[in-house]
Amino acid sequence: MTTPPRLVPLLEQFDWACLRLLNRMMGPEADSGTGTPIPVAPMSDEEYRWEPVPGCWSVRRRVDGPGPGANVLRGAGEWGRDSAEPTHPYPPPFTTIAWRLSHISEMLTLRADHTVGGHNLTSDSYRNSGDAVGAVMAFGAAAQAWRGALVSCDDAALDTVGLSTYPDGSDSEDVFIDIVWWVNQEVLHHGAEIALLRDLYRVRGGLTGRLRPGPGGYGGGSPACGGSGGRPPG
């Protein structure tokens, strides 16, 4: 099926945002922002769950219980993500890379399911990863699932209200192309937060050495989102 023309730039933006985040988390290279590749060390488990300030929300072993200000560990399995019911505290707690990455992956997985899947996944059934490699793989799989939902759409589907029945938002009241735009913003802004936390962890001594420009092209080895693997033109 031909991709609707108005979906093309949003799909390209999504592919690029996912590829850039994957490379920024696990390397071996990432784009410096000027087209110069820089070497990137893989994110460690310690960094993934690093709490830079007191009172962070994170992903925790269920046996350890929720973190400060949380009263529930959301998800299924050994690890849960800090949350609070009926409402989150204000101001919101500072969140770790683990929390932010789990949030993005859950959102993509559930939205894909509630668009082209069984329409039955919930945040309580999502399995969080306690290690960095598992979390990055989960993000890659979630991104692929959401991309699959996008490329299944024809032009009429983009204007359909309630095509996504994702329960943790206003999806049932929104045209689908607005949801596509919103999901891109979620990946972009949380991806930027994760990149900044990696920088902060590095300068606080968690990683040795300084990043230096390296030879070669843009790191195309990451299992991204089905795009071309390179930087979009322009």
Language-model-detected regions and their locations in the chain:
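Acidic/histidine-rich alpha-helical segments that form the ligand environment
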Residues: 127-163, 177-191
